[in-house]
From Swiss-Prot:
One of its GO terms (cellular component) is nucleus. ATP binds at V17, G18, E19, G20, T21, Y22, A23, V24, V25, K40. Belongs to the protein kinase superfamily. CMGC Ser/Thr protein kinase family. CDC2/CDKX subfamily. Protein kinase essential for cell proliferation, where it is required for completion of cytokinesis. Phosphorylates the C-terminal repeat domain (CTD) of RNA polymerase II. Its EC number is 2.7.11.23. The active site is at D133 (proton acceptor). Keywords: ATP-binding, Cell cycle, Cell division, Cytoplasm, Kinase, Nucleotide-binding, Nucleus, Phosphoprotein, Serine/threonine-protein kinase, Transcription, Transcription regulation, Transferase. The keyword ATP-binding applies. GO terms for molecular function: ATP binding; cyclin-dependent protein kinase activity; cyclin-dependent protein serine/threonine kinase activity; protein serine/threonine kinase activity; RNA polymerase II CTD heptapeptide repeat kinase activity; RNA polymerase II CTD heptapeptide repeat S2 kinase activity; RNA polymerase II CTD heptapeptide repeat S5 kinase activity; RNA polymerase II general transcription initiation factor activity. It comes from Schizosaccharomyces pombe (strain 972 / ATCC 24843). This is Serine/threonine-protein kinase crk1. Gene3D superfamilies: Phosphorylase Kinase, domain 1 (3.30.200.20), Transferase(Phosphotransferase) domain 1 (1.10.510.10).
Length: 335
């Protein structure tokens, strides 16, 4: 991949906000515009075969994915020892908002975040890119409330049958077919993650928090019941399939747990968390669901609750240290 040459003096490093095994992240500014940016300095010398593949993927896919709901790749340039990726700086994310119990989520807030998530996802899927690591702390929030997909280090292109890794997507947001070793998949894996995020926005806590890969399947089955025989039959063809004892759906179904949700929310959630990945809606089909046309209308991004500033910068830093690796991470009107 050709790396565009840029004058390294175009950017001023202000302070380090995080460090992983292969990268250091600085808060900085673009000299000419005084714009705040995040500067990822990737230590090229750490990789005997050149640059880490996740860095190249992030650059490639962000170049192909310019959209209001995808983090902007501002610039890329290299020095003798580092590859420098310049990104727009976003000091808040959806996880911060979910965890802040002093912030009250209104149904219109949740609908707005879901619209922006699905719009960004539809955009990358239309360019045959799977994200493969959707979760609340990879959904960043701008100063004017716009949600943006970030952290494309696990992304890859799709379209023709290929042998893809099943060891992707953070456990709590990973669909069951990947635990069973499925290596040929499409947009359905991202849509399962979106369903888990939708549930988390309504519950204000992770919906399917398994403690291990094996436990994760048990958590999913206890929450949704075991799959129907037709789906089990297709799962039996997967290399890591494990026999499962029948578990019925919980009493009252999803409606009992999501008691504040309406029929539209429950219907969309069930579609996204379908065991059959081919029955899960695409991002565009989800945007066309009647949930988004029903009242209330989604809140305008500028009116959404948000956090940021120093607290957000500290969160970015601690998140990168926890990962200890590179990288960090429909026609609907708002009212």
């Amino acid at each position: 991949m050709d790396i565009e040459k840029s004058d390294k003096w175009t950017y001023v490093k202000e302070r380090k906000v995080g460090e992983g095994t292969y990268a250091v992240v600085f808060l900085g500014r673009q000299k000419e515009t005084n714009r705040r940016v995040a500067i990822k300095k990737i230590k090229v010398g750490q990789f005997k075969d050149g640059i880490d593949i996740s860095a190249l993927r992030e650059i490639k896919f962000l170049r192909e994915s310019r959209h209001d709901n995808v983090i902007e790749l501002v610039d890329v340039f290299s020095t003798k020892s580092n590859l420098n990726i310049i990104l727009e700086f976003l000091d808040s994310d959806l996880e911060m908002l979910i965890k802040d119990k002093f912030i009250v989520f209104q149904p219109a807030h949740i609908k707005s975040w879901m619209v922006m998530l699905l719009r960004g996802l539809h955009h990358i899927h239309s360019r045959f890119i799977l994200h493969r690591d959707l979760k609340p702390n990879n959904l960043l929030i701008s100063s004017d409330g716009v949600l943006k997909l970030a952290d494309f280090g696990l992304s890859r292109d799709f379209g023709t049958p290929s042998h893809m890794s099943h060891q992707v997507i953070t456990r709590w947001y990973r669909p069951p077919e990947l635990f069973m070793g499925c290596r040929s998949y499409g947009t359905g894996v991202d849509m399962w993650s979106v369903g888990c995020i939708f549930a988390e926005l309504m519950l204000r806590t992770p919906y399917l928090p398994g403690e291990s890969d094996l436990d994760q399947l048990n958590v999913i089955f206890r929450a949704l019941g075991t799959p129907e025989p037709e789906v089990i039959k297709s799962m039996q063809q997967l290399p890591n399939y494990v026999e499962m004892k029948h578990i019925p759906p919980p009493n009252g179904g999803m409606e009992a747990l999501f008691s504040a949700a309406g029929h539209e929310e429950i219907d969309l959630l069930k579609m996204m968390l379908d065991y059959n990945p081919y029955r899960r809606p695409t991002a565009q089909q989800a945007l066309e669901h009647h949930y988004f046309s029903a009242l209330p209308k989604p809140t305008h991004p500028s009116l959404l609750p948000r956090k940021g500033g120093e607290e957000g910068i500290k969160h970015v830093s601690s998140d990168l240290q926890r990962q200890n690796n590179f990288p960090m991470r429909a026609n609907i009107k708002f009212v």
